[in-house]
Every structure is written in C-alpha cells, then in structure tokens.
C-alpha cells in the first residue's frame, strides 16, 4: 500500500501539472506500464534491471554478444551477464529467498557501493555496510567527507577521471582522497598508501 499510494500520488501530481504523457513505471522484466497496470512485485530490483538494459544496448552498439555488467551505485553493486545478446534471467525469479512465478534478470547485488565507508579493525580492512550518503559524500567530493570510501579508492586507482566525473560537473579532489586513505586506512594498519589501495 505505501508504494501504491506514492505512485498514484505522483501520477495525480503530473496530471495536475497537465503533462501530456502518463507516468510509466519501469519493471524488472524490462518493460514499463502505467501505475494502474503495475504490480509491486514487478518493480522489485527494476533499477538494476534498467542498468542491464543499458548494458545490453551498449553491447549491441559495440558488437559484443557476451558481456559482464558491473554497475556500482552509491550503496550497492549489481553484477549481471549478457550471453548471446540476451540478459541472463531466471525463469522463476527470487525475491528475498522466495520463488515467484515471474521471470527476472539474474543479477547479483552486493551491499557495497561507491559511498560505502572503508574502516579498519583487528582483522584488516572492512567495507560497509555504513555509507556516507550523498552528503557529505566521499572525501574526494570536497564537501566535508572524512571517511574513506570506494569512490576515493577508485579515484586514486585511476578508475575515475577527476576532471570528467559526473559529466565534468564535479571535479574530484585526489589530494583529499589520498589524505583520508592514508589517515584512516594505511596508517592504522602500518601500510603504505599504495598497499592500502
């Protein structure tokens, strides 16, 4: 019911603004439907499914028949496979360990994303489940973040171009990332920053 109320409220709000097109809800089967035709079970994991649809479009564009998609979001990482140009799926999907009667993309989601906080303990390096969120965000964003995150590590490893992050609208600060990795990870574990990465 809360989701239904939210979607209908959004749909009515758009109608109040006289939008020409109806609100369409993306589903985990790769399609979309109006609010009245959408079942909650079809929206479960629809975001990662959308990522797989995007990966499939890129695979087709570049002529790849087989592809592994690795989608790192703020709080999760979603991994899926495209084989012979099709997204791998389960004939009967699984939601929270329960079989359902609908097919679903076979996507593995891990609770570790770009905003996941990296800490240390007596066993070594720990990642998550805590997250810095969008505010203050990773240290390299320059908005006051003081915790090391996956995004800070990716920047220092060269995965991200600091000048082109977020379409060039956000310049990443490698010095801040280096400082937070050194002080919160490398120094407590008596490692070089290189080894901590």
Predicted region positions:
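N-terminally biased helix-coil "hinge/interface" segments that flank
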Residues: 1-197
């Amino acid at each position: 019911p809360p989701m239904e109320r939210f979607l209908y409220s959004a749909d009515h709000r758009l109608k109040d603004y006289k939008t020409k097109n109806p609100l369409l809800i993306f589903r985990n089967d790769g399609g979309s439907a109006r609010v009245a035709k959408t079942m909650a079970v079809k929206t479960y994991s629809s975001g990662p499914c959308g990522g797989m649809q995007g990966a499939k479009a890129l695979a087709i564009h570049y002529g790849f028949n087989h592809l592994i998609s690795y989608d790192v979001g703020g709080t999760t990482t979603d991994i899926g496979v495209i084989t012979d140009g099709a997204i791998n799926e389960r004939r009967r999907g699984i939601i929270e360990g329960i079989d359902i009667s609908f097919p679903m993309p076979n996507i593995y989601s891990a609770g570790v994303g770009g905003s996941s906080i990296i800490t240390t303990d007596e066993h070594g390096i720990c990642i998550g489940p805590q997250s810095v969120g969008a505010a203050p965000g990773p240290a390299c964003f320059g908005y006051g973040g003081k915790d090391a995150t996956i995004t800070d590590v990716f920047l220092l490893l060269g995965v991200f171009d600091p000048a082109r992050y977020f379409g060039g609208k956000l310049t990443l600060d490698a010095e801040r990332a280096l400082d937070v990795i050194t002080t919160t990870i490398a120094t407590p574990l008596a490692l070089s920053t290189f080894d901590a990465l």
